[in-house]
């Protein structure tokens, strides 16, 4: 009996505990990233932003949470009730499930699997189903149009993201996210005879792919300037028009968890994960999770600034950028990277 407990029950309990801790921390981080998003947007528009609930408005996100929870969920009379209520859960659960393999520090991942990046790509590809289900089940034309746009948009830019990931895999030789981070201890800077620093990270050696990944991540998460799924001037709120109360909150949560995931992926694939920017003794004392969070916040700041400054693309411009610009460039970079590694014996 003790052998069964040690072999099966105890590992399951540890994984469950890790999952609960990750979920709580992730929700708190998302709440304050939402607060930061609103503050940055307000600063650009010369406003104060959230400033009522708590000091400097720090508890505004939690007040909004309570407001949504205590509202009455209204289901349209012509809606498919089961699918209508299931869609937000699908969106939120899939967004949070991808975090199981993200290493926020060395050894700090719920599941340090050897196909981690493939797992993320597979699960994140399914998130579009929550949007499609919500748009279809609402039995309204505007949510349905938003869902159709979302399907086309997310599929279009997943192709470019896939080629970006392939390029990183070619340079690293592993699908394990921890290996991808550790491989950035040495890189282009070391080859040029420089001390270990942020110049070794993949953002410099694969800079075109870094830019493509960043812009594709904006489109994949329906962020401005690619927020055509919920374009206020056309579709009001897209697939979320008919949603209120907790179902709307779950859709909103899934969207921001997906944004945070893309920031974490940028940090892991291109910005050295938990590695310090310069290999000096006093920076090595700082816990790796601090560096990871600082880089994640920097990526989110870029997302927020794009939202504040860049006007929305037209739908035809969005599709043209994905298929006629990013796809050829990313495919060329995959071939060029593979050729370079083969010619110089680095494969």
UniProtKB/Swiss-Prot annotation:
Superkingdom of this protein's organism = Bacteria
Q: Which PROSITE patterns match?
A: COMPLEX1_ND1_2
Reaction(s) catalysed by this chain, per the record, are:
a quinone + NADH + 5 H(+)(in) = a quinol + NAD(+) + 4 H(+)(out)
Query: Is Methyltransferase set as a keyword in this record?
Result: no
MF GO annotations: NADH dehydrogenase activity; oxidoreductase activity, acting on NAD(P)H, quinone or similar compound as acceptor; quinone binding
Q: Offer one Pfam family short name for this entry.
A: NADHdh
Q: Which GO terms describe its biological process?
A: aerobic respiration
Q: What is its EC number?
A: 7.1.1.-
**Complex formation:** NDH-1 is composed of 14 different subunits. Subunits NuoA, H, J, K, L, M, N constitute the membrane sector of the complex.
Its protein name is NADH-quinone oxidoreductase subunit H
Record the organism.
Brucella anthropi (strain ATCC 49188 / DSM 6882 / CCUG 24695 / JCM 21032 / LMG 3331 / NBRC 15819 / NCTC 12168 / Alc 37) (Ochrobactrum anthropi)
Which lineage is the organism of this entry classified under, starting from the top rank? Bacteria, Pseudomonadati, Pseudomonadota, Alphaproteobacteria, Hyphomicrobiales
């Amino acid at each position: 009996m003790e052998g069964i407990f040690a072999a099966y029950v105890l590992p399951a309990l540890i994984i469950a505990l890790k999952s609960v801790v990750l979920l709580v921390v992730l929700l708190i981080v998302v709440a304050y990233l939402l607060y930061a998003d609103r503050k940055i947007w307000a600063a650009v528009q010369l406003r104060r932003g959230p400033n009522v609930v708590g000091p400097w408005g720090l508890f505004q996100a939690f007040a909004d949470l309570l407001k949504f929870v205590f509202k009455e969920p209204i289901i349209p009379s012509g809606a498919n009730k089961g699918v209508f209520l299931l869609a937000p859960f699908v969106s939120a659960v899939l967004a949070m499930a991808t975090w199981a393999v993200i290493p926020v520090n060395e050894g700090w991942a719920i599941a340090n699997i050897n196909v981690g990046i493939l797992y993320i790509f597979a699960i994140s590809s399914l998130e579009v189903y929550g949007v499609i289900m919500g748009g279809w089940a609402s039995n309204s034309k505007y949510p349905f149009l938003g869902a159709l746009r979302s399907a086309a948009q997310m599929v279009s830019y997943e192709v470019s993201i896939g080629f970006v990931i392939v390029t990183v895999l070619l340079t690293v030789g592993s699908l394990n996210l921890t290996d991808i981070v550790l491989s950035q201890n040495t890189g282009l800077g070391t080859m040029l005879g420089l001390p270990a620093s942020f110049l070794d990270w993949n953002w410099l050696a694969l800079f075109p792919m870094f830019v493509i990944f960043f812009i594709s991540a904006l489109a994949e998460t329906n962020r401005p300037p690619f927020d055509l799924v919920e374009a206020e001037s056309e579709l009001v709120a897209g697939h979320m028009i008919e949603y209120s109360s907790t179902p709307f909150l779950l859709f909103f949560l899934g969207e921001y968890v997906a944004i945070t995931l893309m920031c974490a992926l940028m940090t892991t694939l291109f910005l050295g994960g938990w590695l310090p920017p310069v290999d000096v003794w006093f920076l090595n004392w700082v816990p790796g999770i601090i560096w990871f969070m600082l880089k994640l916040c920097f990526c989110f700041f870029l997302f927020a600034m794009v939202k504040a400054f860049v006007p929305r693309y037209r739908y035809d411009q969005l599709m043209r950028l994905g298929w006629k610009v990013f796809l050829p460039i990313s495919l060329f970079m995959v071939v060029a990277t593979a050729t370079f590694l083969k010619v110089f014996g680095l494969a």
